[in-house]
Amino acid sequence: MAASMAESCRASLYLARSVRMARPRLAAFASDACRVCTGPSRFQSTGPSEPGGFKPPPKPVIVDRRRVPEDERRFLSPEFIPPRGRTNPLKFKIERKDMLDRRKVLPIPEFYVGSILRVTTADPYASGKTSQFLGICIKRSGNGLGATFTLRNTIEGQGVEICFELYNPRIQEIQVVKLEKRLDDNLLYLRDALPEYSTFDVNMKPVPQEACQEVPVNKLKVKMKPKPWSKRWERPNFNIKGIRFDLALTEEQMKEAQKWNKPWIEFDMMREYDTSKIEAALWEEIEASKKS
């Protein structure tokens, strides 16, 4: 009995001694394992010049692929394109040279029917020898040096329209206050619309717009005054998209207007005027004029 107790005491002492000797080794192994898992530079702040330090990734560069490059979105003013069936091309070539020379003196900006413009002209009877008019462009017509554009505004409840000659030497400045398009290429129906659609503040400030940005299209549809109108705008030959006909006409009147419809005209290829080759030749003339 005594021998067995002595043997058990001896075994327990040997086990305690072995655990005491292995404890430092376990601590060192645990510290090495933590150092390997976390890494020596996990929580250390390294300077920018220290090799192997943490470097933040570069900021992403967002490129809007929907934007059209400025070189591709070139604008050719419509008066440069000669009319169909021209008989004297030399006349239009001489006119274009004169037009380009005048544009070097007076820069004519890009604008469309529906854009809001401010035009400054020389007026010998005004106090400051100049006069200004702001309005919405409702029409562009003419070719060559005879090109014109019409502005409309409502002043003191009265609709006022002024037709300017685009290359008139009395024009001192053409400022685009708001560049935009409308659903139609002709806004003469604003004469028969409510005055609120033709009223603009004469002190309106220009709306900034990037050069590479596409021209916005204003899809506004106007409300008309009660009939009679200056023209039968509901007939299909005008192809008006910017009028709320449902508020001004009845179903019987709309059906009556559709009797004048000629659906075969849109398929008549002889009515199309392909100006692609003419525009390419015109751009060569314009680029040559800029270099000279």
Swiss-Prot record:
In terms of one coarse class, where is the protein primarily found? mitochondrion
Disulfide pairs here are none
Lineage, top-rank taxon, reads: Eukaryota
Q: Where is this region: Disordered?
A: 41-60
User: Key word Ribosomal protein present in the record?
Assistant: yes
* Subcellular location, record wording: Mitochondrion
Q: Note the PANTHER family from the entry.
A: LARGE RIBOSOMAL SUBUNIT PROTEIN BL19M, RIBOSOMAL PROTEIN L19
Family the entry assigns: Belongs to the bacterial ribosomal protein bL19 family.
Q: In its UniProt entry, what is this protein called?
A: Large ribosomal subunit protein bL19m
Gene that encodes it: Mrpl19
